[in-house]
Amino acid sequence: MIITDTPIDTLAGSILDGASISSEQALALTALSGASLQSLFAAASRVREHHFGNQVSLCGIINAKSGLCPEDCAFCAQSSHHATGVACYPLLDQDTLLAGARSVAGHGAACYGIVTSGSGISEGDELEQVCAAIRAIRAEGRIAPGASLGTLTKTAAEQLKAAGLVTYHHNLETSRSFFPQICSTHDYDDDVATVQLAKQVGLRVCCGGLFGLGETMAQRVELALTLRELQVDSVPINFLDPVPGTPLAVMQQLTSLDCLHTIALYRLILPDVHITICGGRQRNLRELQSWVFLAGASGIMTGNYLTKEGRQPADDLRMIEDLGLVIAKEMLR
């Protein structure tokens, strides 16, 4: 199959030699199907193996503060604009956050994310509670602490960095062109600014999106190119698992091949960036969950998600072993 006059394997070779795939080439790849799609997966797997070998990384999260979010994101169970019946509670205490870190580390994960609902964390007592938990996690030395606390001020970012935070997670969720269809309570540039600020203070940045919201494949490419421009360190890929009570509750489910197609595109656009498959994995990929690595992913989130149960870590570990892959053991710094 010829892609903009370049065979897929030749395109992969040029990427491995340091070339960047163009917007036109990426858009052409969105039209692939059938055997050509299998060739795309093979190319993406080749690029993944070049940069990450046979190692894959695991991460886990804790819903550290749930519900009552003032944002109106159309997919979110925790938005106060939607009647979802989600559990609502304030920031968990340090002992609970530390216990969560130990549990996630025990399953071989390299990163543990403390996730709070809301537009952004309140400076003062709430931020200091998170920083205290980060210091305690770093002191045990078993897993790298991450946080997803909404938009950041420079003061908060510097305080988190000083406490020992390794990774800051803040998704753009979708492309700039589609974002107004998903959220009206803040601007896309607010999210971009938080990503830039986190990088500015020296944090590793985890930033990706959620697919199946009604966006086009071209808009998925648009997001990937934005992430490349922002030079993020890790890209989490989520697939919509609709929540009753949200505006997107009746969205049509993605096909497994559509999900894998998206993963492969992201690998070729972001060849040396960690790509982690997170929410919606079981519902959308079903029997093809193990194919995420063959399509170019270099990691998965294991355990529970924010408001839904995830797959048992033991099942994920067995899947990785069956593929002849190994868990990356080195802790992020």
Curated annotation (Swiss-Prot):
Residues annotated to bind [2Fe-2S] cluster: 206
CDD domains cross-referenced by the UniProt entry: Radical_SAM
GO biological process: biotin biosynthetic process
Stored Gene3D superfamilies: Aldolase class I
Pfam family, one: Radical_SAM
Cofactors: [4Fe-4S] cluster; [2Fe-2S] cluster
Cofactor binding, per record: Binds 1 [4Fe-4S] cluster. The cluster is coordinated with 3 cysteines and an exchangeable S-adenosyl-L-methionine.
Keyword set includes Flavoprotein: no
Keyword Lyase: no
Protein name: Biotin synthase
Natural source organism: Trichlorobacter lovleyi (strain ATCC BAA-1151 / DSM 17278 / SZ) (Geobacter lovleyi)
